[in-house]
Amino acid sequence: MINKFLIVLFCFFYSCDNNQYINTYKLPKANSVSINRSSTEDINKKIPFSWDIPAKWNESNKSSMRLASFSASYIGGLADISITSFSGQGGGILANVNRWRKQLGLNPASLNQITNSIVMKKSEFGNYKLIKIINEKEPSSAFLCSIIEIKNSTVFVKMNASVNGIAQLEEEFIAFCSSFK
């Protein structure tokens, strides 16, 4: 018993030191695996549709989920436009619109409310849905979204800008979404 106590006591004192500083260590990175990524042009060749970019819009860096990203200037700010595509219905209109509403601090809407807020527009693929989502209590951020069904997938185009920016860029956004071919 005394031997165990002495061993514990020895370990305790041995592990303590008078150093009052935090030590940090740097380790070399493990060799990373090289992933051969397709160029943007190769990826764009795989997209089964195209669009016409408004003259005042600029391409932006796209993320892993975006097919393309754009920015558009308006008086008072810069809008972010994203294009994403998902197989099938992409989760459905109710889930997507309510996710966007939540991002703007709004409560979920019923499918009937959402359906009543949809404006139908036309592109070469046929009709698409246009939805404007605005939180009147927070005018610094609003969404203008389109849902375009193309073959066996759903394409979502979303503009994020202030309420004022949405009003200024709405015609360009509609022309852009209508240009999908």
Give the ranges of each region predicted by the language model:
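Hydrophobic beta-strand residues in large extracellular and virion-surface proteins
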Residues: 81-83, 131
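Sec-dependent signal peptide recognition
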Residues: 1-8
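N-terminal targeting sequences that direct proteins away from the cytosol to non-cytosolic compartments
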Residues: 5, 14-79, 86-89, 98-114, ...
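Short, hydrophobic/aromatic-rich segments at coil-to-beta transitions
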Residues: 64-68, 123-132
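Extracellular/lumenal carbohydrate-interaction signature centered on repeated Trp-anchored short motifs
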Residues: 92
